[in-house]
Amino acid sequence: QWGREETQHGDALARWVKLADPTFDFEKTFAAFRAGYTPPHFEGSAGSVRGSRRGELIARCVVESGTTSYYSALRDATVEPVLKQVVSHIAGDEMRHWKLFYDLQQAQPELSFWRKLKIAAGRLGEAEDDELAYAYYCANTPIERIGIDPYDRKACAKAYETRLLRVWRPQHLQRAIGMVAVAIGMKPRGWIARGASKLIWTAVKFKTRHAMKAEARAAGRGGVPMARAA
């Protein structure tokens, strides 16, 4: 069920993109992304990179925490009614997926708190790799120019981040932090989670200002295209 719903999410968003911009070839763009990006932990490893099944499920909870927050932010920010409905349904699905993985991990052998924290922090850190930046590059580069126009990871990451931070609000961050906290055995509104939310939100506001300035400079130089968000 989880896998089918994730596929449906992609199909629904692809359909909306085609209606919003008929010139955008989603299939070719997605194929280019798949051809150009492979998660580092998929290379040469047939086993669990988290060390255990519970570790894998914690990592999945982290992912679902982020996607729930992300689609909730899009839902609250957009005024386009079809997109609002689509991302609202997706946000609800992602929350249920988080609950599924959380329930499944409870049946697995327990890990120490520090081990769970390390797994969660490691999965959060993977969001800083090429995945999102390269997705932005593929989505914003003419299909015939992908692989020809240079891929500037740093510029693409900043451009993507700028769009994300424009729609993110404190309540979205608090939800994500709370869900991650529960996944590793912490209280979602405990002092650690609250402190982390405040600290991260302060960093978010700083990065938003910095990213918007960087975007303006890039646009002025005719650099990274800014028309679409990945």
Describe the function of each predicted region.
Residues Q1-A230:
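Non-heme di-metal
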